[in-house]
């Protein structure tokens, strides 16, 4: 049996690289599942239908460990394929709120896992942004950012609400040029997204 790692979205690429290098596991670039192998999957919500279909087609001769990062209000929990994928495989999550939600609402057994280490990136010589925020747009985030900019007109803000920095390299560059990174939840009652904090700390913020 071999253990391999899959990244379903570019935002999880660094996590996948660190895990594979630390444990000397193969990072799959072209997914061709083999019998008896175990696949650790970051961002499985993006690939739910494909992952489930492959498992059915190969008669469950291989397994997944799903590292869920979605919050309890996520639209992906309305995806029947993602729920079925989690019910058929091992699921791990980084916060107890989502673990309890999945158990109670979908009868999905969830294990907790530790915070993965990030690579330490070289720091930029000059941090040109005082405050940085990158994330999806919603009313609360927009209103909060507008208030901060009005209250602190002398600070230089970098704000991206359109996810222009989806790639790891692009995101790392911006964070390495920022002094402070804001971590604002998208959903109400959000769990603390420690993986975002780890990324910012790795970039010296």
Describe each model-derived feature in a short phrase.
Residues 2-36, 40-205:
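Nucleotide-sugar donor-binding catalytic core of glycosyltransferases
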């Amino acid at each position: 049996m071999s253990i391999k790692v899959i990244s379903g979205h570019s935002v999880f690429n660094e996590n996948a690289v660190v895990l594979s290098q630390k444990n000397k596991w193969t990072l799959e670039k072209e997914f061709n599942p083999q019998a008896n192998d175990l696949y650790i999957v970051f961002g499985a919500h993006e690939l739910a239908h494909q992952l489930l279909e492959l498992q059915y087609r190969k008669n469950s001769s291989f397994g997944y460990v799903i590292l869920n990062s979605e919050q309890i209000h996520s639209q992906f929990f309305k995806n029947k394929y993602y729920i079925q994928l989690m019910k058929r495989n091992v699921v791990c999550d980084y916060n107890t709120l989502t673990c309890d939600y999945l158990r109670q609402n979908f009868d999905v057994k969830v294990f907790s896992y530790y915070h993965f280490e990030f690579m330490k990136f070289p720091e930029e010589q000059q941090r040109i942004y005082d405050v940085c925020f990158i994330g999806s747009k919603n009313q609360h985030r927009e209103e909060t950012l507008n208030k901060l900019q009005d209250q602190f007109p002398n600070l230089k803000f970098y704000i991206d609400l359109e996810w222009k920095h989806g790639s790891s390299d692009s995101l790392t560059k911006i964070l390495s040029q920022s002094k402070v990174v804001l971590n604002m939840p998208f959903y109400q009652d959000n769990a603390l997204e420690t993986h975002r904090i780890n990324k910012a700390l790795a970039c010296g913020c």
